[in-house]
Design a protein with these regions (language model features):
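Conserved phosphate- and dinucleotide-binding cores of soluble alpha/beta proteins
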Residues: 6-7, 17, 25, 93-250, ...
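A conserved C-terminal secondary-structure "cap"
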Residues: 247-278
Length: 278
């Protein structure tokens, strides 16, 4: 039995259990011979970000990361707690899920401060050290475009593991310099000393072309793997700064047949995952 957390309208989180076999999708027609799409490769790559995390709060931002977190929970990371973000009424009624408990919304911040969370955020800009911008494009005093705002990015990046999902890998996103830093990268965390660097961990960056990380001596962004059908040259051309590129770059692992069955037959029957990469 796997557990997920569902946000309620009155700022509570109710815990729901997902029952059933983790290995087979319900009503799936997927066979071992079905080739995975690029979106499905990305779902699995996002799922891998939470491997080994144990009982932490998984907070995916975006459809593909959400599918990845749910896939991880159904397979190799059953201890994950998921914030589904569904608005459901507190009044009695049939919801189709089993409420096993609840957690006050205020306790989410306790979990954040304790490092019991791993968020996968988006990014309008990311530089080579992982400094992230989701606030504005251009000079902050007179920006060309106003975006989400800083939001919880600073607290996320100094308190618990953070990964990023970028559905369209381009030099505009992977920029030489972030116009405004919201989530701090490795260079800024180091400059802050112990308060900034103690719990700072940027796990992976998953894009429509590749998986990247910061496993270098100076924590500069590194190409970890390229997705099937993509080339190293494609990733380099789509990045606005020099990447650390190993001599041998592996191919991102494709979904196993059981994972494809879950994605197609249980988690995303409408096939919305492909639209996020379009």
């Amino acid at each position: 039995m796997n557990v997920s957390l569902v946000f309620k309208e009155q700022h509570q989180i109710h815990i729901h259990a997902h029952r059933g076999s983790a290995g087979m999708a319900e009503g799936s027609g997927v066979t071992d011979g079905c080739a995975a799409t690029r979106a499905e490769v990305c779902v699995v790559a996002c799922a891998e970000a939470w491997r080994g995390d144990g009982a932490v709060l998984a907070s995916p931002m975006g459809l593909v990361p959400t599918l990845g977190a749910k896939l991880a929970q159904l397979t190799f990371s059953p201890g994950l707690l998921l914030t589904d973000g569904e608005a459901t009424l507190l009044a009695p009624g049939e919801t189709g899920t089993i409420a096993e408990g609840w957690l006050p919304y205020r306790s989410v911040f306790t979990m954040v401060a304790a490092g019991l969370r791993h968020v996968m955020m988006g990014a309008a800009q990311l530089d080579r050290f992982g400094n992230q911008n989701i606030s504005c494009i251009g000079d902050w005093s007179r920006p060309k475009a106003q975006l989400l705002g800083v939001r919880g990015a600073p607290g996320n990046t100094i308190n618990h593991p953070v990964s990023y999902w970028v559905p369209r890998h381009s030099p505009r996103v992977f920029a030489e310099r972030a116009d405004m830093v919201c989530g701090i990268g490795y260079d800024r965390a180091a400059a802050l000393g112990r308060p900034g660097a103690r719990f700072h961990e940027l796990r992976v960056v998953v894009t429509n072309l590749a998986v990247l990380d910061f496993a270098t001596a100076d924590h500069r962004m590194r190409l970890r793997s390229v997705h099937p059908g993509a080339r190293v040259a494609d990733v380099i051309a789509a990045t606005g700064f020099p990447l650390a590129v190993p001599a041998e770059v592996p191919v991102t692992r494709p979904p196993a047949p059981e994972e494809l069955a879950l994605i197609r037959g249980r988690l995303d029957l409408a096939g919305l995952r492909d639209r996020e990469l379009a």
